[in-house]
C-alpha cells in the first residue's frame, strides 16, 4: 500500500468516527428538554395557595370582661415596658385567686383580710357602682345600705389582701356608673348580707337590668340633669326652669361627632388585639379551670338526726 492510499484511509476513518458515544442508558440533552416541555404542556395549571392563617382567635368580649388589661389612653402616661410587666404580674395574681367576670350593676361579695376583725377576715356584700383605672391599679366600688346607713368600700382588684370575690348576681345596668344611687331611695342599694348566688346558665348572655331608680328630692351630690342618665326615672320632677337652662348651656352635642376625641380617649383596635393576643393563652386556661371547678360536685355529709 502506497503513501497516497494510506493518507486517504486516515481521512475516511476520521470522518466516519462519532464525536460522542451515546449508550442505551443515557439520553441526549435535547431529548430531555423536549420531554420536560411536553410534561409542562400536559400538566394542569396550578393555582397559588395562600398560607394558612394560624393567628389566635380572640373573643370579641375580652375588652369588656378584662378592661384592666388595656392601658390608659393618655399618651403622656404610656410606658410599654411597664405595661408589659404589669400584665405579667396580673396573670400571676389571677393564678393565685379566681377573679370572676362582673360589670357595673353586678352584686358581689368580697372577702378580705382585716387585722382588726374578730376572725382576721371581713366580708362585704354590695352592688358595683363603678369600675375605673387600669393595670395593677384597677379598682371597683361596692355599695350597700346597712342599718339605714349607706356604706361604700373601694377595693383594688389585684390587692393581695383580697381572699375571695363572689358574684352573687351577674348583670349590667343602663349606665356606665351608678353614683346616682347615693341620692336614690335606699331600697335600690340594700342587699342581704346572707344573699345566695343566683346561677346563670353557661354561655348565656349577661342580662341587662333596665330598672329606673327614683331619686330623693334636692339637694343632690351632683347635677344629674347634666349627665344624660338612662337609669333614673324622676329627674324632671325636681327641676326648675333655671336648672334646665343651665343644663342646656353646658351641653356639647357635637362631641359625638368628634372622631379625634374618640381616638384619644380609647385604645385602637389593632393595639387591643395585640395586647389580648399576648395574654389570651393564660386567660383561656384560667377560664377552663374555672369552669371545671364550677362543675365539680361537692359532697356534703348529712347531719346525724337526734
Swiss-Prot record:
List compositional bias (Basic and acidic residues) regions by residue number.
34-43
Q: Which Gene3D superfamilies match?
A: 2.30.30.790
Top-rank lineage group of the source organism: Eukaryota
Stretches that traverse the bilayer: none
- State the Gene Ontology BP annotations: mitochondrial translation
Q: Where in the cell is it found?
A: Mitochondrion
Which InterPro entries does this UniProt record tie to the protein?
Ribosomal_bL19, Ribosomal_bL19_sf, Translation_prot_SH3-like_sf
Disordered: region residues: 34-53
Which keywords annotate this record?
Answer: Mitochondrion, Ribonucleoprotein, Ribosomal protein, Transit peptide
Q: Give a GO cellular-component term.
A: mitochondrial large ribosomal subunit
SUPFAM superfamilies documented for this protein: Translation proteins SH3-like domain
Task: Give the matching Pfam families.
Answer: Ribosomal_L19 (PF01245)
Question: Taking the first listed entry, what is the main subcellular location of this protein, grouped into a coarse class?
Answer: mitochondrion
| Family annotation (PANTHER family) | LARGE RIBOSOMAL SUBUNIT PROTEIN BL19M (PTHR15680:SF9), RIBOSOMAL PROTEIN L19 (PTHR15680)
Assembly with partners or alone:
Component of the mitochondrial ribosome large subunit (39S) which comprises a 16S rRNA and about 50 distinct proteins.
Family membership noted in the UniProt record: Belongs to the bacterial ribosomal protein bL19 family.
Q: What is this protein called?
A: Large ribosomal subunit protein bL19m
Amino acid at each position: 500500500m502506497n503513501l497516497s492510499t494510506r493518507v486517504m484511509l486516515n481521512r475516511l476513518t476520521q470522518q466516519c468516527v462519532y464525536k460522542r458515544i451515546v449508550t442505551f442508558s443515557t439520553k441526549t440533552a435535547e431529548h430531555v428538554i423536549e420531554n420536560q416541555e411536553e410534561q409542562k404542556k400536559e400538566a394542569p395549571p396550578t393555582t397559588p395557595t395562600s398560607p394558612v392563617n394560624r393567628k389566635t382567635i380572640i373573643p370579641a368580649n375580652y375588652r369588656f370582661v378584662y378592661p384592666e388589661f388595656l392601658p390608659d389612653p393618655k399618651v403622656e402616661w404610656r410606658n410599654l415596658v411597664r405595661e408589659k410587666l404589669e400584665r405579667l404580674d396580673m396573670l400571676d395574681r389571677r393564678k393565685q385567686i379566681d377573679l370572676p367576670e362582673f360589670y357595673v350593676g353586678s352584686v358581689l361579695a368580697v372577702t378580705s383580710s382585716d387585722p382588726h376583725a374578730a376572725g382576721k377576715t371581713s366580708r362585704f356584700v354590695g352592688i358595683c357602682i363603678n369600675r375605673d383605672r387600669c393595670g395593677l391599679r384597677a379598682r371597683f366600688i361596692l355599695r350597700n345600705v346597712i342599718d339605714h346607713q349607706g356604706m361604700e368600700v373601694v377595693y383594688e382588684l389585684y390587692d393581695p389582701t383580697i381572699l375571695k370575690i363572689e358574684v352573687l348576681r351577674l348583670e349590667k345596668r343602663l349606665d356606665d356608673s351608678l353614683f346616682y344611687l347615693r341620692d336614690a331611695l335606699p331600697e335600690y342599694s340594700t342587699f342581704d348580707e346572707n344573699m345566695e348566688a343566683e346561677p346563670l346558665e353557661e354561655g348565656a348572655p349577661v342580662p341587662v337590668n333596665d330598672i329606673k331608680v327614683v331619686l330623693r328630692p334636692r339637694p343632690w351630690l351632683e347635677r344629674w340633669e347634666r349627665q344624660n342618665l338612662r337609669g333614673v326615672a324622676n329627674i324632671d320632677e325636681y327641676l326648675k326652669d333655671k336648672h334646665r337652662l343651665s343644663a342646656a348651656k353646658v351641653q356639647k352635642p357635637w362631641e359625638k361627632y368628634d372622631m379625634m376625641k374618640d381616638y384619644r380617649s380609647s385604645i385602637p383596635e389593632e393595639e387591643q388585639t395585640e395586647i389580648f393576643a399576648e395574654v389570651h393563652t393564660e386567660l383561656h386556661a384560667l377560664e377552663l379551670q374555672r369552669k371545671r371547678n364550677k362543675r365539680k360536685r361537692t359532697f356534703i355529709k348529712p347531719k346525724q338526726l337526734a
